[in-house]
Regions:
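Active-site loop/oxyanion-hole signature of alpha/beta-hydrolase fold enzymes
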Residues: 16, 61-103
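Conserved alpha/beta-hydrolase "acid-adjacent" motif
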Residues: 231-239
């Protein structure tokens, strides 16, 4: 009989007193750190796929951001990008990771890039999955209105309103049901929705790095995973394309026309990451 695959190893890292970040790691080999998006958890970077840890020769480390999933709310009340970058540094330090591939989704992509700009010696490669950060914080009332409404829904425990405010009901019918279910399941994984609500207020108002021109400073190879606007308008294809254009060593991948976004397909996304890392083993 085949040897059973051991379960992921849970861990807790405390970047500051009163803040516990919960995560897990699995596999051995080159280290891949997963950094999730706003209102998501560690599961949603590669959609729960365990292919990379089990067959990809990688040590896969994932964690829930402050206030998300199983992690606690920060005692200082800060959820912006400087805090997220500091938390990522703490994860690497406490898990004895000198250098890693960092894969981030949406908010996590901006966090990973900001970390690489601050600590280039600790990053071997990047995977930017559906980047949405366009180089500046949101400042206008119009840009912030929907985020504040989503935060209010979370504070009220009104999951139905939160789901509706994500815009899933305006997606093409072939994507609508899956997107609606995914949003609902994602929100139900948080132990403290009011902490997530505060993150939803703060992150859009926070700057990860100052302008897309800074992308040219990144020397490591970067896999940019784009989604088509039809299924995922909140992560514009044009933004991912601009990342790929400005980065010194980038590969842009996306789904076939008419398919669900590659970022929604854990096994396919994992294979794309594995192929990219096979080409960049340094």
């Amino acid at each position: 009989m085949p040897t059973p695959t051991p379960p992921p190893e849970p861990f807790t890292v405390s970047p500051q007193p009163g803040l516990d970040l919960h995560g897990e790691e699995e596999g051995c080999g080159r280290t891949l750190v997963l950094v999730h998006g706003l209102t998501a958890t560690r599961r949603y970077v590669i959609q729960g796929s365990r292919v990379l840890a089990r067959t990809g020769g990688l040590r896969v480390v994932g964690y829930d951001a402050r206030g998300h999933g199983d992690s606690s709310r920060p005692p200082d009340g800060l959820y912006g990008y400087p805090a997220l970058v500091a938390d990522l540094e703490a994860i690497l330090d406490e898990r004895a990771i000198e250098r890693a591939v960092i894969a981030g989704s949406s908010m996590g992509a901006a966090t990973a890039i900001a970390f690489c700009l601050e600590h280039p010696d600790r990053v071997g490669a990047l995977v930017a999955i559906t980047p949405a950060y366009d180089g500046q914080a949101r400042t206008t009332a119009g840009a912030l209105e929907v985020w504040d409404a989503r935060a209010e829904a979370l504070d009220a425990g009104d999951v139905d309103s939160f789901v509706a405010l994500t815009g899933v009901d305006s997606l093409p019918e072939r994507f609508r049901a899956a997107a609606r279910l995914a949003v609902r399941q994602r929100i139900e994984r948080h132990r403290d929705p009011s902490a997530v609500a505060e993150a939803v207020r703060q992150v859009p108002r926070s700057a990860a790095f100052d302008g897309l021109d800074r992308l040219s400073e990144i020397a490591v190879p970067v896999l940019v995973v784009a989604s088509g606007d039809e299924a995922d308008p909140e992560h514009p294809f044009a933004v991912a394309g601009e990342y790929a254009r400005r980065l010194a060593d980038a590969r842009l991948v996306t789904e076939e026309e008419g398919d669900p976004p590659l970022a929604w397909q854990g096994a396919r996304l994992s294979r794309a990451i594995a192929a990219f890392l096979d080409d960049h083993r340094a």
